[in-house]
């Protein structure tokens, strides 16, 4: 994140250089999670008529996962949340051990989930479990979702679907309601995973 070429650094630099620009800082600006607390959480609760038992989402900035999870857990403290992570990210190990292990950090292809930092929007107390998904498993699921379901979604979304399905195989029982949000479209991946 401190490398001047990183997107974190470039965004900060551009904000300083461009008059009247705005740097939303989606990682540490708690308005990110608050927006999902006020909108996404209530929408899911209403649309499932309060029957949701499990909520799964990719974790990158933490906003959609944690803002939504906070609202849903206030409605149902027994709700289980599953964060989807990628190999090369620190989230899962940090949740399980409390240790920020730099050995967990290495390059990966999946965009939109996983990080080599701990954003302020990631509230680990709101995430019950983490599942890691490989780049390959996500890529395979990308094509499967497009063919079988007609869903043209981004790489992080298919990681969430793959991870949630893996979790569901072992943990869900009849009557459970699992909601996964898919906040990314596939157009930006035409030259990547869809190529």
State each model region's role.
Residues 69-76, 168:
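Surface-exposed amphipathic alpha-helices with a cationic face
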Residues 107, 120, 162-195:
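Phosphate-binding loop/pocket of nucleotide- and phosphate-handling active sites
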Residues 1-14:
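Gly/Ser-rich phosphate-binding catalytic loop and adjacent alpha/beta segment
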Residues 1-3, 87-92, 188:
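Short gly/pro/ser/thr-enriched loop/turn and capping motifs at secondary-structure boundaries
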Residues 18-59, 70, 124, 128, ...:
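Active-site/ligand-binding-proximal alpha/beta "capping" segment
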Residues 58-68, 91, 156-164:
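Short glycine/serine/threonine-rich phosphate/pyrophosphate-binding segments
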Residues 8, 20, 74-155, 193-195:
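Active-site/ligand-binding loops adjacent to catalytic centers
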Residues 25-27, 58, 83-85, 179-183:
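Short beta-strand segments
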């Amino acid at each position: 994140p401190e490398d001047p070429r990183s997107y974190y650094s470039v965004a900060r630099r551009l904000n300083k250089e461009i008059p009247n620009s705005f740097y939303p800082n989606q990682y540490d600006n708690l308005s990110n999670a608050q927006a999902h607390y006020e909108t996404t959480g209530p929408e899911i609760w209403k649309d499932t008529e309060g029957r949701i038992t499990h909520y799964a989402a990719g974790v990158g900035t933490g906003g959609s996962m944690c803002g939504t999870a906070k609202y849903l857990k206030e409605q149902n403290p027994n709700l289980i949340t599953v964060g989807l992570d990628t190999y090369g990210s620190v989230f899962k190990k940090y949740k399980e051990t409390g240790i920020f292990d730099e050995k967990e950090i290495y390059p990966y292809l999946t965009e939109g989930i996983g990080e080599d930092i701990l954003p302020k929007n990631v509230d680990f107390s709101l995430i019950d479990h983490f599942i890691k998904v490989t780049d390959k498993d996500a890529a395979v699921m990308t094509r499967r979702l497009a063919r079988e379901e007609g869903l043209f979604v981004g790489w992080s979304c298919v990681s969430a679907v793959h991870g949630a399905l893996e979790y569901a195989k072992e943990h869900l029982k009849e009557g459970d309601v699992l909601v996964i949000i898919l906040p990314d479209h596939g157009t930006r991946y035409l030259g990547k995973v869809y190529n």
